[in-house]
Each structure stands twice: as C-alpha cells, then as structure tokens.
Amino acid sequence: APFNWIQPTSKNDSVKISDGWYACGYDVYMAHEIAKKMGKKLKVVKVDWDGLLPALTSGKIDAIIAGMSATSERKQAIDFTDNYYTSNIVIVTKKNGKYSEASKLEDFSGAKITGQLSTIHYDLIDQIPEVKKETALEDFSSMVSALNAGKIDGYISEKPSAMAVVSTNPNLKYIEFEDNKGFEFSQEEIAISIGIKKGSSIKDEINEALATISEETRNQIMDKAVKNQLAINN
C-alpha cells in the first residue's frame, strides 16, 4: 500500500531500517517532514501490525505512523495526534467480475468480502446487506491474492491503497460510492492519525508540525508515494 512498504534499495527517499532493507511510502515521507520540523533525527522501526500498540506502550517506539485510524477502541489504549491523511473508503473487486458495475452497498449483497485484520475496514463489512463476511486478512497483498484466486469477491480499502493495487493489477478495479450509497462512518474513524503513548509530551510537538503541512502538500506527498510504489513494483 502507498502508506508504507519495504524495499531492498535506498531509492525514492526511503529510510534504512535493518538487515539491508529500507522503509518507504507516505508514512515515511510524512514522518521525515514531521521529524525535520521537530528538529529530531528520524529512526524507522519495522513492527508487525498487531505488535504496534505493544511496541508503543512498552517504549520500543515513540510513535506509530502506519496508516492507523484513531478508533474509539484504540483510544482506550493510546493517544492520537491530529490526522495526517483523510481518505474515502472503497471496495476492490475484479474488473470483469460479478460486482464490477456495483454503485451502492446493496449491490454487494451475497458477496464474499473481507478487510484487513484489526481495522475499521473489517468492521464496516457488517453494513453490507446479507454479506458473506470472510475471515480478516493480515495485509493488502494477502487480500489481493485471495481476490485473484476467487476466494473472495472483494475487500474494503482506503482509496490510495486501492489506487496503488489497481495500477499494478489491471484485472482489478475499485468501487467508489456516492454520498448516502456507501459506508457510514465518522471522519474521525477513517482519518489517519499518529499513535502516541498515553500522556506523551510529544503530542503537542507533532500537532504543531502537522499544522504547518498543508492539505495540498499532503496530497502531493501521497501522489509521490503512489508513483514510487508503482515504480518499485514494475
């Protein structure tokens, strides 16, 4: 997904992590901007998705910049900054499949749909009438593989990740819904924010840094991430 990935080279303004690998993507670019404005040196630590909250609360990392939304459940365990990206929610499906012309949630009635483990995306599946909710999957590559193999009919994603997937999988497409025809959620639930330890003093510092990065600049950084991911995958 354009939010973050690892690669074996230092191209595209990536940051070295460990074992000769480099982290890249929107999260990394934004982390670099924030660290620069805070006068800090950026260090990126690779942590599995389910290990992010424990890594933060144990002090292994200072902040989670990993495409994470500030859900009410997560807020019970950690604090969040202001958002650093807001996106629409879409469904990725096969371009020539049964649901390729869908335009509203009801059109996915009876479809086998999944989402990423421990995300708002997976919870939103319940809003589709008579849906066949499949087991949550670990990451986007797993969901794409399941979709291509016919194990699922679609998966829920934020738009930038869907754009990146479709650009490298021409047999897939994403369905973007018009107002009142798609998922119901609060902007707070889908806004991507930075997770920090409860009571951490860096919250205000990060928010001050974020306030200086305009919406236009954030969109330019996302465009750069999508473009660079496409270049890596090709």
What are these model-predicted stretches?
Residues 120-137, 174-178, 207-234:
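Ligand-binding clefts/hinges and TM-proximal coupling segments of bilobed small-molecule sensing domains
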Residues 51, 67-77, 124-127, 141, ...:
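A ligand-binding cleft/hinge motif common to bilobed small-molecule-binding domains
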Residues 4-18, 31-40, 120-140, 144, ...:
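Ligand-binding cleft/hinge of the Venus flytrap
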Residues 1-68, 76:
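Extracytoplasmic small-molecule ligand-binding "clamshell" domains
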Residues 12-13, 94-112:
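Flexible hinge/capping segments at coil-to-helix
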Residues 86-93, 167-210, 230-234:
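Periplasmic-binding protein-like
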Residues 26, 43-54, 100, 135-149, ...:
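Short helix-initiation/N-cap motifs at beta->coil->alpha
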Residues 39-41, 58-66, 111-112, 148-161, ...:
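Alpha-to-beta junction loops
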